[in-house]
Every structure is written in structure tokens, then in C-alpha cells.
């Protein structure tokens, strides 16, 4: 066992997570069509503060993330402060770590708490796949800059004459890695082939995710942590996530064609997480501050770890790399965990990480560790379903997972929970949570 790194303040306070909330998650271009991420962020933070009845001046910092950023609101965190009635003097800044963005936001607030610069803060994230920053070609962008500096009409017309029709076509946000040109689905296909993961295994995991998420909703387990969203023109509220296929069968999954490697692939739209809109946030405090305010925490942040690997081959192995570090820093093993929640970007990616967590060879030859991190107990794993079912608003997923895991730990009488995710750029994140 390596060095244990307790997450406590200088006064010995633990980092308490006192509350968490999210919007329902909606598939791209459905319920939240036309609602930008900044408005989703305002929606969830405003409701979170209203529900907890925490005075606005108590919150000293807000760290928020957005992966698909809009040029008109580059600092989403500050816009949320200004748009929710929070104290205008509240420090606010934005972060981005791809699919692990709200993990990073939580870590940043926790570090401020440990440093003693604040005693309470909010962390979270929001993304919209329905309101996108549609850009222009590089050639058109350059011409427009030059036109702005041109002094005469003839100079402007000469510049415009250089353009061709293709230069005027809109440019949507990139879906591929900047450094490799590979799409996330291409990497998932790599991983399926590398680790021998079949189409049937991927479809089975996706089906399990939807079935468990549907059951969680039907049993009322998510009602406290998901707000009702009222959306213009306010004819019908969104109460639940609208991506969950509770009535699907395995035969339905088998009908879909591969989405990336059309000829030999196994990754489909059904065994991948969909493009999604939504927001999520959590309130963190020092343990003593929560007691002063009479608040009973959902739980505590025990440890966290971030990792990075190469992006050319199987780059979505973040959980396999970050989990052993987070467990080590928490002074725990896989066997000590009550729950394990892993982000399901793709079924192939999820199954590959599960395989490697239990691999002695991977631990020895790749991580340089004496023993495997540990086998994943299916009865503890994604017990309420995962991102394939709920959807994945990139910057919101981590806060969803943290809140969901803490609520479930409390229902089970407490214990330790692991939340972990892969992210674009070969990044990984893992956090160990504790509930009493």
C-alpha cells in the first residue's frame, strides 16, 4: 500500500458534500432544444440553493465546467453567479477536463477548502449538445479579419473574391481528437478488438444499464436528486431523463448496425452513450461549517486521482489507471468498496476497464504494481445503471455520479463508493466517497 493522503483541512475537518442536484438529462434536440448550457447551469444551481435554503453569502466560490463552450459566455461559472441571485462577490471560474470536468470542479473546490481560503463552495458542470458553437472555415475566418482591417471597398471585395463556396459552409464542433483525428467511437472499437470484447457483451451491458436506470426511476430512488425542469414555452415540464429505454430487449440491440467501423465493428448507437443536454452541481463545505449551519452531509470526499495516458491506442482506460491511485490515497482496496460507479462512455470502454482492473499482468507490466487493483463485483457495479442509459452531458456527468452514489450509499447504511471516468485526451479520474 502506498501513501495515504487524507483530505482534511488544517483544522482536521473532512470535506463534506452536503447536497447534490441535477436536471433531468435529455437527448440532443429534444426537451432542452434551444436551451444553452449556461441556462441549464443557472437552473440547477438556483434550484439547489433554494432547496437547501443556504444563504447566498455562505457560498464563497463556484467552480463550474462546460466542455462545448459558447464564445458569448466563456466563463459559465461567473454567469451562473450573476444569473442566480448569488452574492456578486462570489469567486467563480470555469474548468474543462472533457468528460471528467465536474470531477475537476469538485477537486478544485475541495483544494480551496483544504487550503482554508473558503469554507463552502459549489462545483458542477453543464453541457448542451443542442445549442452548439457552429463556426466558419479557417479561410473565411482569416478573410473576415482582413476585411475588418481593409480601408476601401475595393480591398474588401478583392478579399471576398478569394473565397469559394466550400469556404462558406458552417463548421460544427469537432468530434475527433485534435492530436490524432480519432473519434471516441474509433477508440472504443480499438478497445473492443484489443481486449476481445464481443458485440453480445456490449449489448448486454447496455441493456443492463437501461434496465437498472428504469428500475431506479420506477422505485423513486432518483426523485430527491433530480429536479423538475420547466422549459419555454412552459407547456410541459421535464421530470425524468428521456433517454432510458426501459422496455427494450436484447434483440432490439442486435438490430443496430455498427456506427464507426461499418464493416467489422461492434460499437453501435445503442451500446454507446448518446449526445445529451443537462446540468448537475454539488455543494461542498468543511465538516465544521456544515455543523454550524445544522446541515447533515450526504457524505465526504475521501480521495481523488487524475491520470493521463497516450491517445493513439486504447486511450479510454482512465478508470484502470486512476482507480488504484484513488484507492491507495484513501487507504482502501476494491474489497472495501460498497459501490462502484464507472462512467459508461461506451460499453466496450467500460468492459475493457473492468477487465484491466482485475488483470495481474496489466498491473505488473503497465502500472508497475505488484498486484491487480481488484476484480469488480457485479453486485456493486453501476447498480442504478450508468451513462449509456442516463445520457452524458459531458461536464455534468461527474456531479451526477457523485450525487447518485452518495444517495445510494445512504440507502444502504453507509460505506465507501468509487466513482471513476475516462475522458478525451487520454485522461482519467477517480474519487472515493464515504457516507455514514
Swiss-Prot record:
Catalyzes the final step of fatty acid oxidation in which acetyl-CoA is released and the CoA ester of a fatty acid two carbons shorter is formed. One of its GO terms (molecular function) is acetyl-CoA C-acyltransferase activity. It catalyses: an acyl-CoA + acetyl-CoA = a 3-oxoacyl-CoA + CoA. Pathway: Lipid metabolism; fatty acid beta-oxidation. The keyword Ribonucleoprotein does not apply. Heterotetramer of two alpha chains (FadJ) and two beta chains (FadI). Belongs to the thiolase-like superfamily. Thiolase family. Pfam families: Thiolase_C, Thiolase_N. It is found in: Cytoplasm. The active site is at 99 (acyl-thioester intermediate), 392 (proton acceptor), 422 (proton acceptor). Keywords: Acyltransferase, Cytoplasm, Fatty acid metabolism, Lipid degradation, Lipid metabolism, Transferase. Disulfide bonds: none annotated. This is 3-ketoacyl-CoA thiolase. It is an enzyme of class 2 (transferase). GO terms for cellular component: cytosol. InterPro entries: Ac-CoA_C-AcTrfase_FadI, Thiolase, Thiolase-like, Thiolase_acyl_enz_int_AS, Thiolase_AS, Thiolase_C, Thiolase_CS, Thiolase_N. Its EC number is 2.3.1.16. GO terms for biological process: fatty acid beta-oxidation.
